[in-house]
Regions:
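Signature of the first transmembrane helix
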Residues: 3-61, 96, 156, 210-239, ...
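Interhelical loop/hinge segments that connect adjacent transmembrane helices in multipass membrane
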Residues: 4, 145, 169-173, 185-226, ...
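Membrane-interface junctions at transmembrane-helix termini in multi-pass inner-membrane proteins
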Residues: 124-146, 332-363
Length: 494
């Protein structure tokens, strides 16, 4: 069995690549492209985000668990893969056709938007070959790391070569869409070396629809939350607000993604432990994984919260500074979302409670729909308010998860909540540091050397504060990672 630590490191490496390159390309694109054209792109991307989940129909999350359970049985592995792949092909074809003919429902006859819309359709077609769930279930994280590095470099070079003036939005869309297609094709041909297609009867597809529908809703909960917010913002007709919301979300998601990805690698192992009846190993991995997760994600989120305006200024220049508060709010939301992910994915999902996840997600999504509708009805178009409705709805979802887990006694949540509180208290010192630094060394919100010095001082003092509190409380996770770092340093020196 492959090392969970090596898997986590490889997956974190993938996430690091997915941080560095989007920051480089995003910063470049935000400065080069016309703000109106980029608003068109983000509006179309919002609509595409609605169709993408239907193309794979929950196969990613369901397949991750299904493949994990049969990966030791070659015959069953081929059968599960074949049935899910065939289903995905059918769903992708149907979804692509609906997408193409749905253009008039969302946009007027704008030639630029129409070109962007059609070119983005390539990303829908590419979902036929979207089989990353197999690689993750088989824990092929080293392959995923190298493939991601290749695709990211290819994308970066292509953007710098072909996107050169403010109206190259269609060219940019084509680069992004073709990169997605190439990415999936590489994974497809890699997996096909070891897994074969087998014949599957039509009757064998019927039992898949209910769990896949549950996974469709569970895995794409953002459609009822942040996606719904963006959809309402698109309906307001103020494209710049869509860009503010999208860029702020992208900054936080990309940076926080390096940590959220690391926790995801344990889902196949958790499913494996439960499948083998190893309850104690399962509980230990959940507790340990959640603690490591919070160890990193909470200080990262609080840090992004206090530096939200500066982050979007550096990322998108002065023309997107209006999204600063949104960036801070998204950072706070990351903590809520982290707990939702731990309780939903690692506890409810791995224990087979997809229906309960679906029900609770729908309840919370309906709450968000009601709140967003009230804002829209009363002509309140400020994007920050729409994000706050999502945060309230996701907090409600978290409460439902906690109540159900305690009722069914699936796992004692005391350990998870204890360290969530501890790391939150440690990270709260960042807020005091922020105000003290800005009182002593105030700067204007323009990109210059004083701004970067101010940010560096805040980040350095915050890191020292966090580490100091970890040392003071003799935090075992901190000393474990410190030991790994010292050991690695010695090996490098030798």
């Amino acid at each position: 069995m492959k090392s969970i630590k090596l898997n986590a490191l490889a997956f974190m490496g993938i996430r690091v690549l997915n941080i560095i390159f989007p920051i480089l390309t995003g910063t470049y694109v935000a400065r080069v492209l016309d703000r109106t054209d980029y608003g068109y792109f983000n509006s179309v991307d919002t609509i595409l985000s609605f169709f993408l989940p239907f193309a794979t129909y929950g196969v990613y999350n369901y397949g991750l668990r299904a493949i994990s359970n049969v990966k030791d049985n070659k015959k069953e592995l081929n059968k599960v893969f074949s049935s899910l792949f065939y289903l995905c092909v059918a769903c992708t074809i149907i979804t692509t056709l609906v997408y193409v003919f749905s253009y008039p429902l969302f946009f007027t006859a704008n030639p630029i938007i129409k070109k962007i819309y059609l070119v983005m359709g390539v990303q829908l077609v590419a979902q036929i070959f979207s089989i990353e769930w197999v690689n993750e279930a088989l824990e092929n994280y080293s392959f995923l790391f190298y493939k991601t590095a290749f695709i990211r470099v290819l994308m970066l070079v292509s953007i710098f070569l072909f996107v050169k003036n403010e109206h190259d939005i269609v060219v940019y869309t084509l680069v992004m869409s073709l990169s997605t297609l190439i990415n999936y094709l590489i994974s497809y041909f890699w997996i096909k070396r070891d897994i074969k297609f087998v014949k599957v009867s039509l009757s064998e597809f019927k039992p898949l629809f209910l769990p896949l529908t549950a996974m469709l809703i569970f895995a794409n909960a953002n459609m009822l939350f942040t996606f719904l917010d963006r959809l309402f913002l698109v309906k307001t007709g103020i494209d710049v607000n869509v860009s503010y919301y999208t860029i702020a979300q992208r900054i936080v998601t990309v940076i926080a993604g390096v940590v959220t990805g690391a926790i995801g690698v344990s889902v196949p192992r958790l499913s494996y432990y439960l499948g083998k009846g190893k309850k104690e190993e399962y509980v230990n991995l959940v507790n340990r994984g959640s603690r490591i997760f919070n160890f990193f994600i909470i200080p990262l989120s609080i840090g992004l919260m206090i530096l939200g305006p500066q982050a979007i200024l550096v990322y998108g220049s002065e023309k997107y500074i209006g999204g600063g508060i949104l960036t801070s709010l998204f950072a706070v939301r990351t903590i809520i979302l982290a707990l939702d992910t731990i309780l939903g994915s690692q506890i409810l999902f791995t224990n087979g409670y997809e229906r309960r996840i679906t029900l609770y997600t729908v309840f919370a999504g309906i709450l968000n729909l009601i709140l967003d509708s009230l804002l829209y009805f009363y002509d309140i178009y400020t994007p920050e308010y729409y994000l706050i409705t999502t945060m309230l709805s996701e907090t409600f979802l978290l409460i439902l998860y906690i109540l159900f887990i305690n009722k069914r006694k699936l796992i004692n949540l005391r350990h998870i909540l204890k360290y969530t509180l501890r790391y939150s208290l440690f990270s709260s010192t960042f807020i005091l540091i922020y105000f003290l630094v800005n009182f002593i060394y105030p700067v204007q919100m323009v990109i210059n050397l004083p701004l970067f010095i101010n940010m560096f001082i805040i980040m350095a003092l915050s890191a020292l504060s966090y580490i100091g509190l970890l040392v003071w409380t003799k935090d075992s996770i901190f000393y474990e990672f410190l030991g790994h770092f010292i050991s690695l340093k010695k090996r490098v020196i030798k």
